[in-house]
From Swiss-Prot:
It comes from the Bacteria. It comes from Bacillus subtilis (strain 168). The glycine cleavage system is composed of four proteins: P, T, L and H. In this organism, the P 'protein' is a heterodimer of two subunits. Its cofactor is pyridoxal 5'-phosphate. Its EC number is 1.4.4.2. One of its GO terms (biological process) is glycine decarboxylation via glycine cleavage system. This is Probable glycine dehydrogenase (decarboxylating) subunit 2. The gene is gcvPB. GO terms for cellular component: cytosol; glycine cleavage complex. It is an enzyme of class 1 (oxidoreductase). The keyword Oxidoreductase applies. Disulfide bonds: none annotated. SUPFAM superfamilies: PLP-dependent transferases. The glycine cleavage system catalyzes the degradation of glycine. The P protein binds the alpha-amino group of glycine through its pyridoxal phosphate cofactor; CO(2) is released and the remaining methylamine moiety is then transferred to the lipoamide cofactor of the H protein.
Length: 488
């Protein structure tokens, strides 16, 4: 069977085929019905595949070759920070004292693990300029919701129930308005100015006595630093609102600037992005939230504290928003982030930002002659191009992304942010070499030339992948999400 015709594991099944055998029974045989109630016993056997161990190994090895990850190739997905994840992280996370413990163990038996969590929170407080951090949230959007729920609790504790609106820029991550809605707020959008930054006059018009918070990413999703951030903080604070920092782009300012020093009251981080937890496959992640002093009472409980040299959880938090996750966060990702921070140190984290920004600006300048550059200025860790020039030739940004697959690259983020037509958002990260950047630049230049000379080649891409272009409308309206077993 060719790689193109890869069968489902169910289709490899043959009745009676097994992958292992059990030793002969040396204890009395007991019927399952004698142990379990009929409520828990199937009327019919589950339709599970019957395959050999070799079948399984070849099947999943073949599938793995269809995947693209940071370890297999360049992954310039904008606003996702697809950097290399050092393998020392995996080694430390697999230490039995970390990997083989359970959250229900007695605290005295896991003091080392609790110390790691406590120290990690202190490192994150220092990095962000916050006064206290919770590690409970499972990922970025979960962190957003947690931070917004704390802001809501803060206003309600003051009897300020009219603060029902959260302001977001038109360049915001899509999770920002979504998180605000789930947290019970209405969203108000403010526009960007000609420089790609928040329009201060529009912000002033939007802020009022109903404003609960302004959610902001800095640098923003255009890769541009909000230079007037202190003035923006003053506008929001004078109106009685809070300033929320979406930490998706923290990789651009590590050891260079701290959200707390810019005037932010709440910060969420993406440890799986900035601090090298493996991501891109759906989880797990880690989205810690840091707050300034006046929001500490509302942190999720329990709060990890150190008392008389011993680490313990404090449940006596009457104003806390409650738990936001069972137990204490995604521990394995936190171990990896802690390992990364300790191995890099302050100087190493500073170098991360410097190289991430350098790589992004290098690529931007190299590609600017071939694609439209909406904001022709110094960028931070990522930048956006526009495919408007190619669109006039009949080649869409989607076509460009599909054509990149033929060169072995994961495409950049496309059509986001929404305020840039035919947007192409590229984030190279700090871990890529100049040779890798140059090869990707050459591919992008070749595609731009193909759009002029042979647009059909780009329009019909990809040409070398196993799966070509799907019917995306049909996939969205009539998804096939599971295998339907045939009648036996």
């Amino acid at each position: 069977m060719s790689n193109q015709d890869q069968a489902l594991i169910f289709e490899l099944s043959r009745e009676g085929r097994i992958g292992y055998s059990l030793p002969e029974l040396d204890v009395p045989e007991i019927e399952l019905g004698d142990l379990l109630s009929d409520t828990y016993i199937r009327d019919e056997d589950a339709a599970l595949p019957e395959v050999s161990e070799l079948d399984i190994m070849r099947h999943y090895t073949a599938l793995s070759k269809r995947n693209h990850g940071v370890d297999s190739g360049f992954y310039p997905l904008g606003s996702c920070t697809m950097k290399y994840n050092p393998k020392i992280n995996e080694k430390i996370a697999r230490i039995p004292g970390f990997a083989a413990i359970h959250p229900l163990q007695d605290e005295d038996t896991v003091q080392g693990a609790l110390e790691l969590l406590y120290d990690l929170s202190k490192h994150l407080e220092e990095i962000t300029g916050m006064d206290e951090v919770t590690l409970q949230p499972a990922a970025g959007a979960h962190g957003e919701w947690t931070g917004l729920m704390m802001i809501r609790a803060y206003h309600e504790a003051r009897g300020d129930f009219k603060r029902t609106k959260v302001i977001v820029p038109d360049s915001a991550h899509g999770t920002n308005p979504a998180s605000a809605t789930v947290a019970g707020f209405e969203t108000v959008t403010v526009k960007s100015n000609e420089k790609g930054l928040v329009d201060l006059e529009d912000l002033k018009r939007a802020v009022n006595e109903e404003t609960a918070a302004l959610m902001l990413t800095n640098p923003n999703t255009l890769g541009l630093f909000e230079e007037q951030i202190t003035e923006m903080a003053e506008i929001v604070h004078q109106a009685g609102g809070k300033l929320y920092y979406d930490g998706a782009n923290l990789n651009a300012v590590l050891s260079k600037a701290r959200p707390g020093d810019m005037g932010f009251d709440v910060v969420h981080l993406n440890l799986h992005k900035t601090f090298t937890g493996p991501h891109g496959g759906g989880g797990p992640g880690s989205g810690p939230v840091g707050v300034k002093q006046d929001l500490i009472p509302y942190l999720p409980k329990p709060v990890l504290v150190k008392k008389e040299g011993r680490f313990t959880f404090d449940y006596d938090r009457p104003h806390a928003i409650g738990r936001v996750k069972p137990y204490y966060g995604n521990f394995g990702i936190n171990v990896r982030a802690y390992t990364y921070i300790r191995s890099m140190g302050p100087d190493g984290l500073k170098a991360v930002t410097e190289n991430a920004v350098l790589n992004a600006n290098y690529m931007m300048r190299k590609l600017a002659p071939y694609y439209d550059l909406p904001f022709d200025r110094h960028c931070k860790h990522e930048f956006v191009l526009s495919g408007k020039r190619q669109k006039k030739l009949g080649v869409r940004t989607l076509d460009i992304a599909k054509r990149l697959l033929d060169f072995g690259y994961h495409p950049p983020t496309i059509y986001f942010p929404l305020n840039v037509e035919e947007c192409i958002m590229i984030e190279p990260t700090e871990t890529e070499s100049k040779e890798t950047l140059d090869a990707f630049i050459d591919a992008m230049i070749q595609i731009a030339k193909e759009a002029e000379e042979n647009p059909e080649l780009v329009q019909e891409a990809p040409h070398t992948t196993i799966v070509k272009r799907m019917d995306e409308t049909k996939a969205a309206r009539h998804p096939v999400l599971r295998y339907e077993a045939e009648e036996r």
